[in-house]
């Protein structure tokens, strides 16, 4: 992966971290299961009504899979946010280092400033909590509409 990132000239960029976590097997299987749970009758009815395949995807499949997309966004963000080895390998510039590498800078060979580590860890939870709270309504919609039939 590192050689591929270097050949695309994305080494030492945040985009390299995002691309390495954007298309994971978890995301593929989560979205597959989400699309398989949507009844075929909906897409067949849309085809009969004259809707194109893109229209079926954009007007039926995508809105019904909002909860799965929100889940995928949250899990991907948390995975990238908590990644330690990826930034350690792909980022060389000090100003591009992530907060996880910054937490490691509080630990020296002989001591660790635990009060600063805990304060920084608490601050690093704020974006994850904000993302979860902003995506929470999609979970509620998914649970509310999952029991509806036809």
Regions found by a protein language model. Name each.
Residues 1-150:
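A structural signal for multi-pass alpha-helical bundles of membrane permease subunits
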């Amino acid at each position: 992966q590192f050689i591929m990132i270097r050949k695309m000239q994305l080494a030492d960029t945040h985009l390299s971290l995002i691309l390495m976590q954007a298309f994971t097997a978890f995301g593929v299987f989560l979205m597959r299961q989400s699309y398989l749970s949507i009844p075929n009758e909906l897409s067949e009815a849309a085809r009969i009504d004259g809707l194109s395949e893109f229209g079926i995807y954009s007007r039926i499949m995508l809105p019904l899979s909002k909860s799965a997309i929100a889940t995928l966004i949250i899990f991907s963000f948390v995975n990238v946010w908590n990644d330690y080895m990826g930034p350690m390998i792909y980022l060389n510039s000090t100003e591009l280092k992530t907060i996880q590498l910054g937490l490691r800078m509080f630990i020296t060979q002989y001591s660790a400033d635990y009060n600063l580590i805990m304060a920084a860890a608490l601050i690093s939870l704020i974006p994850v909590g904000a993302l979860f709270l902003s995506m929470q309504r999609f979970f509620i919609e998914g649970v509310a509409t999952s029991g509806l039939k036809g």
